[in-house]
């Protein structure tokens, strides 16, 4: 029997707990997390709740009740949970997502054998474009050839705008289950992705054209965030927090200009979804949120993982490709991106991101081949961009 007031969430990480679990848990749902961290699993099962610390002008806290957890290594229990849950959510990142979807498929198949009339909706709380098709293909590969995936499984893409900083180790030692987050609490998701009625949850914001909103998140929010980190680090490598570099008017104005250039592109690409004034207001709000001192978001966290953030379909190149498609200027976006090739920020313990160090060394060895072989740039389609980046790379620390 399906429990319509239960959500199973793959990933008891920062977004899973501070956002998805919090929205559903505080709306009367039973929340079941699937995770690999034994400390988190044991803690959730013991306390049956956890605390979300809201960081802002006035600190607040939310206690999320009615919570439990299952180890991702307990395949049978995970399949059973999937088969009986009212709705699923995943927040694990692309690499892990690829590994868990086959288990979800097994749960879907079991569910269908018990109750073929009750479809399963899966909220894809991932920062990736085309997440629904990515998951759909893996489901198809792991279900019987005649399984009605498109009729029985709803794949709901999202635009995750909530900012969640790294929690200091001293805080985790005192309270392992706590998560920090900003007050922003709107989950934008695909209204057309649901097979069952959309849950009546405060904070859900269904949209009819989710692609536009996913691109807005990537090409304004993520783009601006990374721009502030990369340019801020270039000018102020000694600083730790994002709000600190945004106190420099030069960093602030350049970040805003880059975001506005991307807004121009988005308005051209999605005229039925956005106006420039809408996006300008969104940018102003985002910059205020980026400057939230209480959040203590580090330059390291915002800029780290260069291979992903400078990749061929992420925040910079994705917006550049859209600009190329509509013959729109993207020079500021390109310049902002170029600062990322010199980003060497370290965490508060003085440690860098391991894969970033390897990537930066590969750039020094052969810049152009690193763009094509590691970041996935197309040597033909992206040739004009590659040529400009080569020129910018030869001028390290150039000031805008």
What is the predicted role of each segment?
Residues 2-8, 14-400:
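Substrate/ligand-engaging "lid" and interaction regions
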């Amino acid at each position: 029997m399906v429990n319509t007031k239960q959500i199973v969430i793959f990933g008891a990480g920062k977004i899973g707990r501070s956002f998805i679990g919090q929205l559903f848990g505080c709306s009367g749902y039973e929340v079941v997390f699937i995770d690999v961290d034994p400390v988190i699993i044991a803690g959730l099962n013991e306390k049956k709740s956890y605390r979300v610390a809201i960081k802002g002008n006035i600190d607040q806290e939310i206690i999320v009740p009615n919570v439990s957890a299952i180890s991702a290594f307990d395949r049978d229990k995970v399949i059973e949970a999937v088969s009986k849950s009212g709705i699923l959510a995943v927040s694990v990142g692309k690499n892990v997502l690829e590994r868990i979807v086959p288990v979800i498929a097994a749960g879907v198949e079991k569910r269908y054998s018990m109750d073929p009339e009750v479809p399963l909706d899966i909220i894809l709380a991932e920062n990736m474009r085309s997440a629904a098709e990515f998951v759909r293909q893996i489901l198809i590969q792991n279900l019987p050839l005649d399984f009605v995936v498109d009729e029985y499984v709803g794949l709901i893409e999202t635009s995750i705008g909530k900012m969640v900083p790294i929690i200091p180790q001293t805080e985790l030692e005192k309270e392992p289950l706590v998560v920090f987050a900003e007050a922003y609490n709107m989950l934008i998701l695909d209204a057309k992705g649901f097979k069952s009625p959309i849950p009546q949850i405060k904070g859900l914001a269904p949209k009819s054209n989710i692609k536009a909103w996913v691109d807005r998140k990537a090409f304004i929010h993520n783009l601006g965030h990374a721009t502030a980190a990369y340019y801020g680090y270039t000018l102020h490598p000694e600083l730790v927090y994002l709000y600190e570099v945004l106190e420099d008017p030069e960093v602030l104005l350049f970040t805003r200009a880059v975001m506005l250039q991307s807004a121009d592109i988005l308005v051209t690409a999605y005229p039925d979804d956005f106006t420039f004034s809408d996006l300008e207001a969104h940018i102003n709000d985002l910059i205020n949120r980026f400057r939230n001192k209480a959040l203590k978001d580090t330059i390291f966290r915002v800029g780290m993982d260069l291979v992903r953030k400078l990749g061929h379909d992420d925040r910079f190149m994705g917006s550049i490709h859209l600009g190329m498609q509509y013959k729109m200027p993207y020079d500021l976006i390109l310049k902002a991106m170029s600062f990322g090739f010199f980003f060497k920020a370290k965490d508060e313990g003085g440690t860098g991101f391991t894969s970033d160090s390897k990537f930066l060394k590969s750039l020094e060895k052969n810049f152009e081949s690193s763009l094509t072989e590691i970041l996935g740039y197309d040597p033909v389609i992206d040739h004009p961009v590659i040529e400009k980046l080569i020129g910018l790379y030869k001028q390290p620390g150039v000031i805008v």
